């Protein structure tokens, strides 16, 4: 059997009364107030024999240290002593009288009499724990559900309605709270064993006011088209007359017994490029040559000259009789067009 050792409070009283440890003494013996030297080990002048004998004696008393066998560890001795002091219910520290810094640091403690000791909390029986658990379990159920099993928000919504129709989904019982549309009296059905839970369904007629939809609350708004967008649209989109005129040139062709519609060679280039026609009409000194390519090439600065093919059409708005050379590249036409446009803009 393990040897019973003395508890910490009587052991401390014995150490104080022995007067063998420097700095450990009574401040007020009647009130059981005493001080313990508590100098930090990192301070200059700290000594094991002078500043840590109380902690070493407690380690020997608890069997954590044996002189000549174990290696001295003052830090662990002090930590174990502090934990033991804090765990005692009948000893408390007087913090306003303690000095924890400096070479003469110490802590002041007071031994509480029996009347001032805190009473131990008794353990609760199993029946008390079960009753408390049931009470905690029932509280959220009662607070979150109403009579019909609906939460408070839903029940408030249904109570605010003027007329309700209660429908039981299990036994098909209908209790109508208003007369029928033909003016007949109210019909009531009595059942011997009505169910406990009923589903509440709201039924509305065509005469009832329907809630406003999102489109009625927020009408659709279309911002006006800017002048820039209008001018761009008129230049790029052909009119209805131009589309109708373009559709008149469709011809039927029969290839290998199959019918096809074709307008090759019949379409007017002014309808194909309405934006170009508008662009050319405002420039009297501009002449644009349109050519068809069998194999389009990528747009770059090194365009080869076009082969000698007859020009399909020449669009000109000027009355001048000047002629252009047949071999004129597209890059030169675009460059000239940009030069003319820049000159007209600067002159304006």
Swiss-Prot record:
A GO BP annotation: regulation of transcription by RNA polymerase II
Subcellular location: Nucleus
Gene Ontology CC annotations of this record: nucleus
Residues with PTM N6-acetyllysine: 75, 78
Coiled coil: none
UniProt feature, compositional bias: Polar residues: 314-323, 339-348
Keywords carried by this UniProt record: Acetylation, Activator, DNA-binding, Isopeptide bond, Nucleus, Repressor, Transcription, Transcription regulation, Ubl conjugation
Location of the region described as Disordered in the Swiss-Prot/TrEMBL record: 117-137, 311-348
Assembly, per entry: Interacts with CREBBP in growing cells; the interaction acetylates IRF2 and regulates IRF2-dependent H4 promoter activity.
Function: Specifically binds to the upstream regulatory region of type I IFN and IFN-inducible MHC class I genes (the interferon consensus sequence (ICS)) and represses those genes. Also acts as an activator for several genes including H4 and IL7. Constitutively binds to the ISRE promoter to activate IL7. Involved in cell cycle regulation through binding the site II (HiNF-M) promoter region of H4 and activating transcription during cell growth. Antagonizes IRF1 transcriptional activation.
Protein name as catalogued: Interferon regulatory factor 2
Gene that encodes the chain: IRF2
């Amino acid at each position: 059997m393990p040897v019973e050792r003395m508890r910490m409070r009587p052991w401390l009283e014995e150490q104080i009364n022995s007067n063998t440890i420097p700095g450990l003494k009574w401040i007020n013996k009647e009130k059981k107030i005493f001080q313990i030297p508590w100098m930090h080990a990192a301070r200059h002048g700290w000594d094991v024999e002078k500043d840590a004998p109380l902690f070493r004696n407690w380690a020997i008393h608890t069997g954590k240290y044996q002189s000549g066998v174990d290696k001295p560890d003052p830090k662990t001795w002090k930590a174990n002593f502090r934990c033991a002091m804090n765990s005692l219910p009948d000893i408390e520290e007087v913090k306003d009288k303690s000095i924890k810094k400096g070479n003469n640091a110490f802590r002041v403690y007071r031994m509480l009499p029996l009347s001032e000791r805190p009473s131990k909390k008794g353990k609760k029986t199993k029946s008390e724990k079960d009753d408390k658990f049931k009470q905690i379990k029932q509280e959220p159920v009662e607070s979150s559900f109403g009579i019909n099993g609906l939460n408070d928000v839903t029940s408030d919504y249904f109570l605010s309605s003027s007329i309700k129709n209660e429908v039981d989904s299990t036994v098909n019982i209908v209790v109508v709270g208003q007369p029928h549309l033909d003016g007949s009296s109210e019909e009531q059905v009595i059942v011997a064993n009505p169910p406990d839970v009923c589903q509440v369904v709201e039924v509305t007629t065509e005469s009832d006011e329907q809630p406003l939809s999102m489109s009625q609350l927020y009408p659709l708004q279309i911002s006006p088209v800017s002048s820039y967008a209008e001018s761009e649209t008129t230049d790029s989109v052909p009119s209805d007359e131009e589309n109708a005129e373009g559709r008149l040139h469709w011809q039927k062709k029969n290839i290998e017994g199959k019918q096809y519609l074709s307008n090759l060679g019949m379409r007017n280039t002014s309808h194909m490029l309405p934006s170009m026609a508008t662009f050319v009409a405002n420039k009297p000194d501009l002449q644009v040559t349109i050519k068809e390519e069998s194999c389009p090439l990528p747009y770059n600065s090194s365009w080869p000259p076009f082969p000698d093919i007859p020009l399909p059409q020449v669009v000109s708005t000027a009355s001048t009789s000047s002629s252009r050379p047949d071999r004129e590249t597209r890059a030169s036409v675009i460059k000239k067009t940009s030069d003319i446009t820049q000159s007209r803009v600067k002159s304006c």
